[in-house]
């Protein structure tokens, strides 16, 4: 597919371009507004790389005055649209496939079709990545763009060949038949397509059905099987894997430790060694109705959960709930009388039934793993935010599931209206009990009984001193990590005077800090002199992507996986102009002048950047600056040759001295530098790297905001200089997939809880209306624990959010496995025990988007811990439970002897 070049289109008058960035911004804004006003299913959207879109946003944000005068450092118009950083490297240009686990507004943006058309007219580029708008949800219909269509692996039963089929999840079974038959050339009346999940025939798909693929429980990357009437191979396959397979019992594990399947990759692909049409009897679809009763000595609760395509987050949360003793006990009994099918806040009992069915299968005998397909389908129906195949947050899924189960099991069929009374200086215990009873009068379920507690909230008006006290229920405690206040960043410093090799520095800066904070920390780390400054820039694809010149800009705009450099410069004298010189490095098989508009030029390494003040600038001046930069990279034993017109050599010392004059002295006139041959082949180029003009010593260059040149490296230069120092820039923050990190900077769960309970002012967007002042005030808020539940869940807030990105904190949190004593944090003193022990953990490994969830859970009766990694289950030592991957902690109350006796007496009376 050939996309026309924007330069060609301008030259030939193919399209009319906006005359200013402001006009361009206005046109796009109007098109976006028009699209939002006319939302309908099937509208087309296009995926654009966030990197390119950010450069475009900065371009159109400048004023017309800045653009015309050239005063803005962001005046450069972006090059062609470039989506190559978000598509698979081996992707077909005519059918580009997005990389897995990308995040919207972090890796890509979505624009309506009309906006895409305009951007392509103005900039060209691509490749185009088209997606459709779909409508989903049960009670509340919402629109969303299906960024990742359903990917199915089609196995042809005739020859066992495999083909990838891509369709939207809302496509019908009928459409699936049409696509498969068109692809294979099989008449539709002879085709039979099976749901072949886990290489087992789970059901024949009806060729005439308009049921969607999602409603049919087909999931990302799963197998489907094509059988053709009259084919001997298909007949053989049918006889060996037909419906009689359902009669084959699952063989119970003969080991005390169930190892189910193998490790599952975080993108939803399971590792398998050999492909076969014959089934592996290792897993069970949760749609099955058969259950086996646990025999004597058999263990339940050791079944894994198959990954259905980035569902490790769901599997982790489900395993933690599936090992919560009171919840397991409740759902393994008959709970049908508690199902509330008429609750408008519930899901007609369907979510509770799906969860209960899944729980029974996880605790039945002979289970190696369970495929939670029916549960996933119900979840997507009632919570469209969890539909599709993007990675999600296990805590967010847990919060929705607990709330949904409560509403489906709420015994209160008709909620009474209760007018809340003012506290009127009454004792706290009286008000708290009254509000808890009000809450219970409208909310009565096993979830409330087991998982909900109560905290005290105190607000103090900063103006009049009015105190407001309320008591509110909670399902879990989301506690901050004190380390979220800071952030470590690694930046590579380049010395423009050639005094040192490029050096990476890692500094600690405020999480919500500014560019000034980073420059100050870097300056301290690299011993920056008073007459020196640092110029920060992001390097992408071996070019300068953007500069960070506004000291007040937020650090949140810098992502952890970006490559940031700082150029150490001598400060320019006051009154002198500042023009940037960017030196790019290139090398390719054909000489640059023989390349076609730069397409054969292969860039490498990190650009050199400095300020220059000689006007006009000559080729010899640039050569001198380049030699200065390269001087510390000179190999000790490299051959040294003076340039003679055909061979390159390093410059004599006089040239290196000239460079410092160009960089620091605005009044220096360089007369003798232009009399020499250049030591490198240097080309003047544009910001897109499409045009090249060879430079000679005497070449005269007018300076703009940024002057870009390209240096052509050949084998001789690589022999003379160690170019490895220009490559392999470290990321701002490299997140390790391993959770076993140093615990030097560990914090305790208690310090997290204390940060959660600490008094703090409300945010400006969360003002409190003071009933005394009759004004919204930024009051001070203080939380205290009042009533704790039997099951206490701590959510460690490892993920922080800003306008530009999400960030993860990998700090190790030291949490007790036994004897978590919360007595001193509970204001309501009574005879209850506030001692807890850990029984489950939801873990998150790696960074955002590309991470993976697992779970630790304890079989309490056996006092043994197990690791649940999707379908893989293994025993684990208790000492391994505590690591920096811990994300959600599940504790159960350890009752005192008095409480235990009271509970036993109550049970006997019932």
Curated annotation (Swiss-Prot):
Its EC number is 3.4.19.12. Recognizes and hydrolyzes the peptide bond at the C-terminal Gly of ubiquitin. Involved in the processing of poly-ubiquitin precursors as well as that of ubiquitinated proteins. Residues 68-89 are annotated as: Disordered. It comes from the Eukaryota. Pfam families: DUSP (PF06337), UCH (PF00443). InterPro entries: DUSP-like_sf (IPR035927), Papain-like_cys_pep_sf (IPR038765), Pept_C19_DUSP (IPR006615), Peptidase_C19_UCH (IPR001394), Ub_carboxyl-term_hydrolase (IPR050185), USP_CS (IPR018200), USP_dom (IPR028889). Residues 303-894 form the USP domain. The gene is UBP9. The active site is at residues 312, 852. GO terms for biological process: protein deubiquitination; proteolysis. Keywords: Hydrolase, Protease, Thiol protease, Ubl conjugation pathway. Belongs to the peptidase C19 family. This is Ubiquitin carboxyl-terminal hydrolase 9. Residues 19-134 form the DUSP domain. PROSITE patterns: DUSP, USP_1, USP_2, USP_3. GO terms for molecular function: cysteine-type deubiquitinase activity. The keyword Transferase does not apply. PANTHER family: UBIQUITIN CARBOXYL-TERMINAL HYDROLASE. The keyword Protease applies. It is an enzyme of class 3 (hydrolase). It catalyses: Thiol-dependent hydrolysis of ester, thioester, amide, peptide and isopeptide bonds formed by the C-terminal Gly of ubiquitin (a 76-residue protein attached to proteins as an intracellular targeting signal).
């Amino acid at each position: 597919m050939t996309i026309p070049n924007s330069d060609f289109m301008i030259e030939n008058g193919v399209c009319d371009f906006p005359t200013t960035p402001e006009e361009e911004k206005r046109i796009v804004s109007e098109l976006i507004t028009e699209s939002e006003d006319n939302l309908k299913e099937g509208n087309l959207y296009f995926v654009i790389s966030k990197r390119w879109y950010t450069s475009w946003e900065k371009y159109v944000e400048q004023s017309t005055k800045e653009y015309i005068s050239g005063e803005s450092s962001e005046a450069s118009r972006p090059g062609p649209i470039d989506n190559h950083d978000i598509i698979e490297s081996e992707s077909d240009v005519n059918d580009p496939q997005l990389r897995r686990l990308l995040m919207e507004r972090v890796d890509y943006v979505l624009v309506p079709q009309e906006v895409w058309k305009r951007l392509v007219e103005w900039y060209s580029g691509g490749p185009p990545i088209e997606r459709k708008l779909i409508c989903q949800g049960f009670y509340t219909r919402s629109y969303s763009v299906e960024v990742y269509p359903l990917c199915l692996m089609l196995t042809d039963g005739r020859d066992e060949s495999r083909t990838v089929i891509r369709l939207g999840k809302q496509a019908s079974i009928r459409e699936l038949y049409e696509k498969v038959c068109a692809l294979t050339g099989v008449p539709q009346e002879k085709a039979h397509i099976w749901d072949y999940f886990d290489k087992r025939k789970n059901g024949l798909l009806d060729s005439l059905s308009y049921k969607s693929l999602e409603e049919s429980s087909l999931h990302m990357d799963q197998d489907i099987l094509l059988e053709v009437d009259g084919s001997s191979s298909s007949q053989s396959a049918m006889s060996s894997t037909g419906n009689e397979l359902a009669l084959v019992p699952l063989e119970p594990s003969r080991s005390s430790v169930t190892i189910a399947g193998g490790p599952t990759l975080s993108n939803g692909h399971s590792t398998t060694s050999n492909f076969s049409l014959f089934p592996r009897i290792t897993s069970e679809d949760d749609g099955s109705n058969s259950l086996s009763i646990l025999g004597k000595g058999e263990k339940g609760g050791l079944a894994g959960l198959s990954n259905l395509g980035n569902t490790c987050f769901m599997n982790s949360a489900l395993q933690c709930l599936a090992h919560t003793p009171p919840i397991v006990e409740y759902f393994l009994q008959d709970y049908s009388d508690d199902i509330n099918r008429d609750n408008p806040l519930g899901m007609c009992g369907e979510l509770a039934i799906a969860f209960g069915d899944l729980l029974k299968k996880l605790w039945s005998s002979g289970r190696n793993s369970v495929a939670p397909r029916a549960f996933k389908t119900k979840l997507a129906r009632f919570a469209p935010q969890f539909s599709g195949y993007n990675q999600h947050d296990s805590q967010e899924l847990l919060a929705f599931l607990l709330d949904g189960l409560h509403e489906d099991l709420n015994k209160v069929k008709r909620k009474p209206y209760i007018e809340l009374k003012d506290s009127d200086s009454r004792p706290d215990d009286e008000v708290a009990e009254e509000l808890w009873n009000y809450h219970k009068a409208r909310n009565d379920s096993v979830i409330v009984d087991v998982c909900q507690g109560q905290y005290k909230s105190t607000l103090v008006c900063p103006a009049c001193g009015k105190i407001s006290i309320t008591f509110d229920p909670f399902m879990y405690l989301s506690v901050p990590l004190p380390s979220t206040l800071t952030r470590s960043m690694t930046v590579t410093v380049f010395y423009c005077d050639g005094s040192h090799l490029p050096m990476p520095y890692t500094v600690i800066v405020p999480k919500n800090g500014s560019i000034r904070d980073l420059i100050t920390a870097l300056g301290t780390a690299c011993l920056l002199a008073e007459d020196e400054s640092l110029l920060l820039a992001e390097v992408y694809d071996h070019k300068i992507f953007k500069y960070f010149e506004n000291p007040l800009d937020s650090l949140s705009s810098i992502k952890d996986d970006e490559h940031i450099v700082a150029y150490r410069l001598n400060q320019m004298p006051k009154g002198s102009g500042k023009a940037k010189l960017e030196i790019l490095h290139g090398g390719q098989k054909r000489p640059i002048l023989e390349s076609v508009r730069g397409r054969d030029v292969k860039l490498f390494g990190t650009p050199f950047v400095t300020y220059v003040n000689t006007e006009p600038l000559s080729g010899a001046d640039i050569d001198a600056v380049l030699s200065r930069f390269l001087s510390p990279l000179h190999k000790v034993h490299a051959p040294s040759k003076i340039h003679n017109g055909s061979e390159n050599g390093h410059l004599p010392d006089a040239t290196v001295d000239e460079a410092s004059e160009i960089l620091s002295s605005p009044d220096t006139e360089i007369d003798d530098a232009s009399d020499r041959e250049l030591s490198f082949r240097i080309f003047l180029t544009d910001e897109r790297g499409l045009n090249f003009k060879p430079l000679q010593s005497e070449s005269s260059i007018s300076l703009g905001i940024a002057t870009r040149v390209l240096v052509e490296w050949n084998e001789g230069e690589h022999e003379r200089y160690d170019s490895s120092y220009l490559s392999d820039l470290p990321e701002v923050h490299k997140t390790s997939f391993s959770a076993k990190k140093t615990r030097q900077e560990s914090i305790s769960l208690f310090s997290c809880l204390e940060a959660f309970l600490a008094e703090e002012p409300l945010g400006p967007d969360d003002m409190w209306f003071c009933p005394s002042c009759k004004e919204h005030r930024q009051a001070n808020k203080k939380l205290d624990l009042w009533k704790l539940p039997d099951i206490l869940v701590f959510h460690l807030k490892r993920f922080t959010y800003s306008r530009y990105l999400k960030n993860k904190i990998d700090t190790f949190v030291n949490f007790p496995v036994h004897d978590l004593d919360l007595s001193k944090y509970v204001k309501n003193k009574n005879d209850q025990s506030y001692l807890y022990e850990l029984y489950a953990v939801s873990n998150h490994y790696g960074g955002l988007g590309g991470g993976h969830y697992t779970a630790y859970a304890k079989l309490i009766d056996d006092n043994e811990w197990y690791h649940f990694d999707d379908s893989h289950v293994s025993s684990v030592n208790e000492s391994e439970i505590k690591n920096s991957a811990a994300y959600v902690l599940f504790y159960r109350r350890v009752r005192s002897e008095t409480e235990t006796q009271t509970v036993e007496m109550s049970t006997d009376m019932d």
